[in-house]
Amino acid sequence: MDRRQCIQRVLAGERSERLPRALFGGGLWSYRQAGLLIEDIAKAPAVFAQGLANVFGDLNTDIIFTGSGLNSFPAETIGGKLSFRGEQAPLLLFPIIQKAADACYLTDLEIADSPYSLALIEMIAGLRKRLPDRYFCATSWGPFTWAMILCDWHLLQDKVVSDRKFVQEVCDLGVRLSLSLYEPLIDRGLIDGISIPDGAVTLIANDLYREVVIPYEKKLFDLVRARGAGCFLHQCGNIGQQISLYPETGADCITIDAGVSIGNAYRLYHERLVTAGNVDVINTIYGGDQKHLCTAVAESVAGISDPLYRYILMPSCDLPPDTPVNKVKEFLACADRIPS
Protein backbone atom coordinates (compact mmCIF):
# COMPACT_ATOMS: atom_id res chain seq x y z
CA MET A 1 0.00 0.00 0.00
CA ASP A 2 1.49 3.35 -1.05
CA ARG A 3 1.15 6.67 0.73
CA ARG A 4 -1.72 7.78 -1.48
CA GLN A 5 -3.76 4.70 -0.65
CA CYS A 6 -2.90 5.11 3.03
CA ILE A 7 -4.57 8.53 3.19
CA GLN A 8 -7.51 7.42 1.08
CA ARG A 9 -8.15 4.63 3.58
CA VAL A 10 -7.83 6.99 6.54
CA LEU A 11 -10.45 9.31 5.01
CA ALA A 12 -12.71 6.33 4.34
CA GLY A 13 -12.69 5.48 8.05
CA GLU A 14 -10.49 2.39 7.75
CA ARG A 15 -7.79 1.60 10.29
CA SER A 16 -4.21 2.42 9.34
CA GLU A 17 -1.38 -0.10 9.31
CA ARG A 18 1.04 2.62 10.47
CA LEU A 19 0.78 6.17 11.77
CA PRO A 20 -0.12 8.50 8.87
CA ARG A 21 2.01 11.64 8.70
CA ALA A 22 2.24 14.77 6.58
CA LEU A 23 3.52 18.30 6.45
CA PHE A 24 0.75 20.85 6.29
CA GLY A 25 1.29 23.34 3.47
CA GLY A 26 5.02 23.58 2.97
CA GLY A 27 4.75 25.51 -0.28
CA LEU A 28 6.88 28.56 0.51
CA TRP A 29 9.32 26.33 2.38
CA SER A 30 9.66 23.93 -0.56
CA TYR A 31 10.21 26.72 -3.11
CA ARG A 32 13.07 27.99 -0.97
CA GLN A 33 14.51 24.49 -0.62
CA ALA A 34 14.41 24.08 -4.41
CA GLY A 35 15.87 27.55 -5.08
CA LEU A 36 12.73 28.68 -6.91
CA LEU A 37 11.21 32.17 -7.15
CA ILE A 38 7.41 32.05 -7.08
CA GLU A 39 6.98 34.68 -9.80
CA ASP A 40 8.92 32.45 -12.24
CA ILE A 41 6.34 29.64 -12.23
CA ALA A 42 4.45 31.06 -15.22
CA LYS A 43 7.60 30.81 -17.33
CA ALA A 44 8.79 27.39 -16.20
CA PRO A 45 6.17 25.10 -14.61
CA ALA A 46 8.21 22.02 -15.57
CA VAL A 47 11.22 23.38 -13.69
CA PHE A 48 9.03 23.89 -10.63
CA ALA A 49 7.64 20.36 -10.92
CA GLN A 50 11.12 18.86 -11.00
CA GLY A 51 12.37 21.06 -8.18
CA LEU A 52 9.47 20.18 -5.90
CA ALA A 53 9.72 16.49 -6.82
CA ASN A 54 13.33 16.58 -5.64
CA VAL A 55 12.30 18.17 -2.34
CA PHE A 56 9.24 16.08 -1.53
CA GLY A 57 10.66 12.90 -2.99
CA ASP A 58 13.21 12.99 -0.19
CA LEU A 59 10.59 13.42 2.54
CA ASN A 60 8.50 10.73 4.21
CA THR A 61 5.26 12.70 3.93
CA ASP A 62 2.05 10.99 2.84
CA ILE A 63 0.38 14.18 1.56
CA ILE A 64 1.67 16.96 -0.68
CA PHE A 65 -0.36 20.17 -0.45
CA THR A 66 0.10 21.25 -4.05
CA GLY A 67 -0.12 24.97 -4.67
CA SER A 68 0.39 25.81 -1.02
CA GLY A 69 1.36 29.47 -0.73
CA LEU A 70 -0.18 30.29 -4.12
CA ASN A 71 -3.82 30.48 -3.01
CA SER A 72 -4.42 33.93 -4.49
CA PHE A 73 -3.64 32.92 -8.09
CA PRO A 74 -7.30 32.40 -9.19
CA ALA A 75 -8.04 36.08 -8.41
CA GLU A 76 -6.49 36.81 -11.81
CA THR A 77 -9.70 35.45 -13.37
CA ILE A 78 -11.60 38.52 -12.12
CA GLY A 79 -8.91 41.10 -12.79
CA GLY A 80 -6.76 40.72 -9.68
CA LYS A 81 -3.15 41.85 -10.01
CA LEU A 82 -0.76 39.67 -8.05
CA SER A 83 1.86 41.16 -5.78
CA PHE A 84 4.95 39.00 -5.36
CA ARG A 85 6.70 39.61 -2.06
CA GLY A 86 9.86 37.54 -1.99
CA GLU A 87 9.39 34.47 0.20
CA GLN A 88 5.92 35.54 1.33
CA ALA A 89 2.71 34.30 -0.25
CA PRO A 90 1.55 36.45 -3.19
CA LEU A 91 -1.46 38.64 -2.43
CA LEU A 92 -3.18 41.34 -4.50
CA LEU A 93 -1.77 44.75 -5.36
CA PHE A 94 -5.12 46.32 -4.48
CA PRO A 95 -8.57 45.04 -3.42
CA ILE A 96 -10.88 44.18 -6.30
CA ILE A 97 -14.06 44.90 -4.36
CA GLN A 98 -13.90 48.51 -3.19
CA LYS A 99 -17.64 49.16 -2.98
CA ALA A 100 -20.63 46.91 -2.44
CA ALA A 101 -21.79 47.02 -6.08
CA ASP A 102 -18.49 45.58 -7.33
CA ALA A 103 -19.30 42.08 -6.08
CA CYS A 104 -22.40 41.86 -8.28
CA TYR A 105 -20.47 42.18 -11.54
CA LEU A 106 -17.80 39.56 -10.92
CA THR A 107 -19.70 36.69 -12.48
CA ASP A 108 -17.59 35.30 -15.33
CA LEU A 109 -14.63 33.23 -14.19
CA GLU A 110 -12.38 31.61 -16.79
CA ILE A 111 -9.20 29.93 -15.61
CA ALA A 112 -7.71 30.79 -19.01
CA ASP A 113 -7.64 34.39 -17.76
CA SER A 114 -5.17 33.43 -15.03
CA PRO A 115 -1.72 32.66 -16.49
CA TYR A 116 -0.37 31.82 -13.06
CA SER A 117 -3.18 29.35 -12.34
CA LEU A 118 -2.61 27.66 -15.71
CA ALA A 119 1.08 27.34 -14.90
CA LEU A 120 0.24 25.96 -11.45
CA ILE A 121 -1.97 23.29 -13.03
CA GLU A 122 0.85 22.25 -15.35
CA MET A 123 3.29 22.18 -12.44
CA ILE A 124 0.95 19.88 -10.53
CA ALA A 125 0.63 17.66 -13.62
CA GLY A 126 4.40 17.34 -13.79
CA LEU A 127 4.67 16.67 -10.08
CA ARG A 128 1.99 13.99 -10.26
CA LYS A 129 3.99 12.13 -12.92
CA ARG A 130 7.09 12.22 -10.74
CA LEU A 131 5.44 11.33 -7.41
CA PRO A 132 2.43 9.15 -8.25
CA ASP A 133 2.44 7.45 -4.83
CA ARG A 134 1.60 10.60 -2.81
CA TYR A 135 -1.81 11.96 -1.91
CA PHE A 136 -2.10 15.30 -3.71
CA CYS A 137 -4.21 17.92 -1.96
CA ALA A 138 -4.61 21.22 -3.83
CA THR A 139 -5.02 24.41 -1.83
CA SER A 140 -7.08 27.56 -2.22
CA TRP A 141 -8.53 30.12 0.19
CA GLY A 142 -11.69 29.40 2.12
CA PRO A 143 -14.76 31.54 1.28
CA PHE A 144 -14.39 34.16 4.03
CA THR A 145 -10.63 34.40 3.66
CA TRP A 146 -11.28 35.11 -0.02
CA ALA A 147 -13.53 37.94 1.15
CA MET A 148 -10.64 39.42 3.12
CA ILE A 149 -8.30 39.06 0.13
CA LEU A 150 -10.72 40.62 -2.36
CA CYS A 151 -12.41 43.39 -0.37
CA ASP A 152 -11.37 46.77 0.86
CA TRP A 153 -10.82 46.13 4.56
CA HIS A 154 -12.97 49.02 5.80
CA LEU A 155 -15.79 47.96 3.48
CA LEU A 156 -15.69 44.38 4.75
CA GLN A 157 -15.55 45.49 8.39
CA ASP A 158 -18.71 47.51 7.86
CA LYS A 159 -20.56 44.82 5.92
CA VAL A 160 -19.77 42.09 8.45
CA VAL A 161 -21.92 43.90 11.01
CA SER A 162 -24.49 45.48 8.70
CA ASP A 163 -25.05 43.48 5.51
CA ARG A 164 -25.15 39.70 5.58
CA LYS A 165 -26.26 39.55 1.95
CA PHE A 166 -23.00 41.20 0.91
CA VAL A 167 -20.99 38.70 2.97
CA GLN A 168 -22.91 35.89 1.27
CA GLU A 169 -22.15 37.31 -2.17
CA VAL A 170 -18.40 37.55 -1.61
CA CYS A 171 -18.29 34.10 0.03
CA ASP A 172 -20.07 32.67 -3.00
CA LEU A 173 -17.53 34.40 -5.23
CA GLY A 174 -14.80 32.78 -3.14
CA VAL A 175 -16.34 29.35 -3.73
CA ARG A 176 -16.38 29.97 -7.48
CA LEU A 177 -12.78 31.19 -7.49
CA SER A 178 -11.61 28.06 -5.70
CA LEU A 179 -13.63 25.84 -8.03
CA SER A 180 -12.08 27.53 -11.06
CA LEU A 181 -8.79 25.95 -9.97
CA TYR A 182 -10.06 22.72 -8.46
CA GLU A 183 -12.32 21.59 -11.29
CA PRO A 184 -9.67 21.31 -14.03
CA LEU A 185 -7.33 19.57 -11.60
CA ILE A 186 -10.00 17.03 -10.68
CA ASP A 187 -11.12 16.58 -14.30
CA ARG A 188 -7.54 15.69 -15.29
CA GLY A 189 -7.08 13.32 -12.36
CA LEU A 190 -4.21 15.39 -10.98
CA ILE A 191 -5.34 15.65 -7.36
CA ASP A 192 -6.94 13.43 -4.74
CA GLY A 193 -8.31 16.13 -2.47
CA ILE A 194 -8.60 19.83 -1.75
CA SER A 195 -7.69 21.94 1.25
CA ILE A 196 -9.04 25.33 2.24
CA PRO A 197 -7.57 27.45 5.03
CA ASP A 198 -10.29 29.76 6.32
CA GLY A 199 -8.71 31.10 9.49
CA ALA A 200 -10.16 34.55 8.83
CA VAL A 201 -13.43 33.27 10.31
CA THR A 202 -11.87 33.46 13.78
CA LEU A 203 -12.20 37.25 13.43
CA ILE A 204 -16.00 37.20 13.18
CA ALA A 205 -18.79 36.29 15.57
CA ASN A 206 -19.72 32.63 15.85
CA ASP A 207 -23.31 33.23 14.80
CA LEU A 208 -22.17 34.94 11.58
CA TYR A 209 -19.75 32.10 10.92
CA ARG A 210 -22.37 29.42 11.56
CA GLU A 211 -25.25 31.05 9.71
CA VAL A 212 -23.50 32.77 6.80
CA VAL A 213 -20.02 31.36 6.13
CA ILE A 214 -20.32 27.66 6.95
CA PRO A 215 -22.99 27.12 4.25
CA TYR A 216 -20.44 28.27 1.65
CA GLU A 217 -17.63 26.13 3.02
CA LYS A 218 -20.07 23.22 2.87
CA LYS A 219 -21.19 24.17 -0.64
CA LEU A 220 -17.59 24.00 -1.85
CA PHE A 221 -16.93 20.69 -0.14
CA ASP A 222 -20.16 19.13 -1.41
CA LEU A 223 -19.38 20.11 -5.01
CA VAL A 224 -15.84 18.76 -4.80
CA ARG A 225 -16.80 15.56 -2.99
CA ALA A 226 -19.38 14.85 -5.71
CA ARG A 227 -16.42 14.70 -8.10
CA GLY A 228 -14.65 12.13 -5.91
CA ALA A 229 -12.14 14.33 -4.09
CA GLY A 230 -11.44 14.44 -0.36
CA CYS A 231 -12.03 17.67 1.58
CA PHE A 232 -9.64 19.17 4.13
CA LEU A 233 -10.36 22.23 6.27
CA HIS A 234 -7.43 23.98 7.94
CA GLN A 235 -8.22 26.41 10.73
CA CYS A 236 -5.59 28.46 12.51
CA GLY A 237 -5.54 31.30 14.97
CA ASN A 238 -7.82 31.60 17.99
CA ILE A 239 -9.99 28.59 17.13
CA GLY A 240 -11.02 27.43 20.60
CA GLN A 241 -14.51 28.96 20.48
CA GLN A 242 -15.27 27.56 17.03
CA ILE A 243 -13.79 24.09 17.15
CA SER A 244 -17.14 22.39 17.72
CA LEU A 245 -18.57 24.09 14.62
CA TYR A 246 -16.05 22.83 12.06
CA PRO A 247 -17.71 19.44 11.39
CA GLU A 248 -20.75 21.36 10.10
CA THR A 249 -18.66 22.31 7.05
CA GLY A 250 -18.80 18.73 5.81
CA ALA A 251 -15.00 18.38 5.77
CA ASP A 252 -13.50 14.89 5.66
CA CYS A 253 -10.47 16.05 7.64
CA ILE A 254 -9.94 19.04 9.91
CA THR A 255 -6.36 20.16 10.51
CA ILE A 256 -6.06 22.30 13.61
CA ASP A 257 -3.61 24.84 14.93
CA ALA A 258 -1.74 24.79 18.22
CA GLY A 259 -3.46 26.31 21.22
CA VAL A 260 -6.22 23.72 21.52
CA SER A 261 -6.11 20.15 22.75
CA ILE A 262 -5.70 17.66 19.91
CA GLY A 263 -7.19 15.02 22.19
CA ASN A 264 -10.34 17.05 22.78
CA ALA A 265 -10.66 17.72 19.05
CA TYR A 266 -10.25 14.03 18.28
CA ARG A 267 -12.97 13.13 20.80
CA LEU A 268 -15.29 15.62 19.12
CA TYR A 269 -14.51 14.51 15.59
CA HIS A 270 -13.46 10.88 15.35
CA GLU A 271 -16.89 9.35 14.86
CA ARG A 272 -17.47 11.58 11.82
CA LEU A 273 -14.17 12.66 10.30
CA VAL A 274 -10.38 12.72 10.48
CA THR A 275 -8.43 14.92 12.90
CA ALA A 276 -4.97 16.20 11.93
CA GLY A 277 -2.40 18.39 13.66
CA ASN A 278 -1.30 20.04 15.87
CA VAL A 279 2.41 19.84 16.79
CA ASP A 280 3.59 23.43 17.32
CA VAL A 281 5.30 24.39 14.07
CA ILE A 282 7.08 27.44 15.51
CA ASN A 283 8.26 26.44 18.98
CA THR A 284 8.72 22.74 18.34
CA ILE A 285 9.51 21.96 14.69
CA TYR A 286 11.22 25.23 13.80
CA GLY A 287 12.62 26.20 17.19
CA GLY A 288 13.01 23.00 19.19
CA ASP A 289 15.92 20.57 19.39
CA GLN A 290 15.62 16.88 18.52
CA LYS A 291 14.71 15.80 22.05
CA HIS A 292 12.07 18.51 22.38
CA LEU A 293 10.62 17.60 18.98
CA CYS A 294 10.33 13.88 19.68
CA THR A 295 8.82 14.53 23.11
CA ALA A 296 6.25 16.94 21.68
CA VAL A 297 5.22 14.47 18.98
CA ALA A 298 4.90 11.65 21.50
CA GLU A 299 2.80 13.82 23.81
CA SER A 300 0.57 14.93 20.94
CA VAL A 301 -0.08 11.38 19.76
CA ALA A 302 -0.63 10.23 23.35
CA GLY A 303 -3.68 12.50 23.45
CA ILE A 304 -5.30 10.46 20.66
CA SER A 305 -7.23 7.47 21.96
CA ASP A 306 -6.68 5.48 18.74
CA PRO A 307 -3.93 7.01 16.53
CA LEU A 308 -4.48 4.42 13.79
CA TYR A 309 -8.09 5.47 13.30
CA ARG A 310 -9.06 8.76 11.63
CA TYR A 311 -5.92 10.62 12.65
CA ILE A 312 -2.97 12.13 10.75
CA LEU A 313 0.13 13.50 12.48
CA MET A 314 0.77 17.03 11.18
CA PRO A 315 2.29 20.33 12.26
CA SER A 316 -0.07 22.96 13.64
CA CYS A 317 0.29 25.18 10.58
CA ASP A 318 2.54 25.98 7.62
CA LEU A 319 6.33 25.71 7.91
CA PRO A 320 8.33 28.94 8.16
CA PRO A 321 10.29 29.17 4.88
CA ASP A 322 13.64 28.99 6.68
CA THR A 323 12.86 25.83 8.67
CA PRO A 324 15.96 23.56 8.45
CA VAL A 325 15.27 20.47 6.37
CA ASN A 326 16.73 18.21 9.06
CA LYS A 327 14.03 19.44 11.47
CA VAL A 328 11.35 18.55 8.93
CA LYS A 329 12.78 15.08 8.38
CA GLU A 330 13.06 14.54 12.12
CA PHE A 331 9.42 15.48 12.64
CA LEU A 332 8.27 12.99 10.01
CA ALA A 333 10.60 10.29 11.36
CA CYS A 334 9.02 10.64 14.81
CA ALA A 335 5.89 8.99 13.42
CA ASP A 336 7.75 5.69 13.16
CA ARG A 337 8.94 5.87 16.77
CA ILE A 338 5.45 5.94 18.24
CA PRO A 339 4.33 2.50 19.49
CA SER A 340 1.32 1.31 17.50
Language-model segment annotations:
Residues I97-Y105, S195-I196:
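Short, basic/glycine-rich phosphate-binding loops at helix/coil junctions
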Residues F48, F73-A75, Q241, G263:
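Alpha-helix termini
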Residues C6-R9, V47, G51-V55:
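Residue-level detector of alpha-helical secondary structure
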Residues D40-Q50, L59:
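Short, structured active-site "lid" loops
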Residues G51-K81:
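Glycine-rich, N-terminal phosphate-binding loop and its surrounding beta-alpha-beta segment
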Residues M1-S30, G35-I41, D62-T66, R85-L92, ...:
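Active-site loop segments of alpha/beta catalytic cores
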